[in-house]
Amino acid sequence: MAVEKINASSSLAEVVDRILDKGVVVDAWVRVSLVGIELLAVEARVVVAGVDTYLKYAEAVGLTASAQAA
């Protein structure tokens, strides 16, 4: 069985379109401590999505006003 390598290259526009269509969530949590004393804590959640994608997600989890009224 031969291994076939496919060079599928995507343009930047295609990558951005896919990210906005599907959405990306980055959830980060960092804690820096020294000798048991917490010096710095950072918690971040970054969501990158198109408006349509966000509204579908928000309605599904009950974040929109129309979902809360129902």
From Swiss-Prot:
The keyword ATP-binding does not apply. The keyword Cytoplasm does not apply. GO terms for cellular component: gas vesicle shell; vesicle membrane. It comes from the Bacteria. Keywords: Gas vesicle. It is found in: Gas vesicle shell. One of its GO terms (molecular function) is structural molecule activity. InterPro entries: Gas-vesicle_GvpA-like, Gas_vesicle_GvpA, GvpA, GvpA-like_CS. Belongs to the gas vesicle GvpA family. During exponential growth cells contain about 75 gas vesicles measuring 250 x 100 nm. Gas vesicles are cylindrical with conic ends. They collapse by centrifugation (12000 x g for 10 minutes at 4 degrees Celsius); upon resuspension small biconical gas vesicles start to form within 5 minutes. They grow until they are 100 x 100 nm when they start to elongate. The gas vesicle shell is 2 nm thick and consists of a single layer of this protein. It forms helical ribs nearly perpendicular to the long axis of the vesicle. Gas vesicles are hollow, gas filled proteinaceous nanostructures found in some microorganisms. During planktonic growth they allow positioning of the organism at a favorable depth for light or nutrient acquisition. GvpA forms the protein shell. HAMAP family: Gas_vesicle_A (MF_00576). PANTHER family: GAS VESICLE PROTEIN A1, GAS VESICLE STRUCTURAL PROTEIN 2-RELATED. NCBIfam families: PRK09371.1 (NF006874). This is Gas vesicle protein A. It comes from Ancylobacter aquaticus. The lineage of its organism: Bacteria, Pseudomonadati, Pseudomonadota, Alphaproteobacteria, Hyphomicrobiales.
